[in-house]
């Protein structure tokens, strides 16, 4: 998702997604070498399970990151728990979590350690001063 050029909230898509925890329409991503995944339409209801499978290099990891609102090249419509993830990516990722997927989910190079801590605190509604204090304690323990 491009955070610099956010589209306006798609009110019709949010209404269409009513009751779904995940709603995707024409979700896709392209890279320098072509299509990474998609286009994909998907509705996921509460307590429903979705399985993503395919051969290595098919775009599964990118798709899973996109479905959590964490893949910047994503295009299309993505509603996560009533939030338009294309228009409000930071609100959407507060509702999602990603387990470690190889080296894909790592701290962003553009952020310092302090900025990474501040971003996580903002997303998790944790008091920044308390978190900074905890980081200092950890630094003292680990050296």
Residue ranges and their predicted role:
Residues 16-30:
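Conserved N-terminal strand/loop that marks the beginning of ABC ATPase nucleotide-binding domains
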Residues 60:
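Conserved lysine of the Walker
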Residues 68:
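Helix-to-loop junction immediately C-terminal to a conserved catalytic motif
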Residues 84-99:
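ABC ATPase NBD coupling module
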Residues 95, 102, 109-126, 134-137:
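Q-loop/switch helix immediately C-terminal to the Walker
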């Amino acid at each position: 998702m491009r955070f610099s050029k956010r589209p306006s909230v798609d009110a019709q898509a949010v209404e269409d997604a009513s009751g779904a925890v995940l709603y995707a329409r024409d979700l896709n991503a392209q890279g320098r070498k072509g299509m990474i995944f998609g286009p994909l339409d998907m509705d996921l209801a509460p307590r429903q399970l979705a399985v993503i499978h395919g051969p290595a290099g098919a775009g599964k990891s990118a798709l899973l990151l996109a479905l959590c609102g964490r893949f910047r090249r994503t295009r299309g419509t993505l509603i996560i728990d009533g939030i338009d993830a294309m228009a409000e990516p930071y609100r959407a990722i507060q509702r999602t979590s990603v387990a470690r997927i190889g080296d894909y989910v790592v701290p962003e190079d553009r952020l310092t350690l302090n900025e990474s801590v501040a971003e996580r605190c903002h997303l998790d509604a944790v008091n920044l001063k308390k978190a900074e204090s905890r980081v200092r304690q950890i630094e003292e323990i680990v050296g």
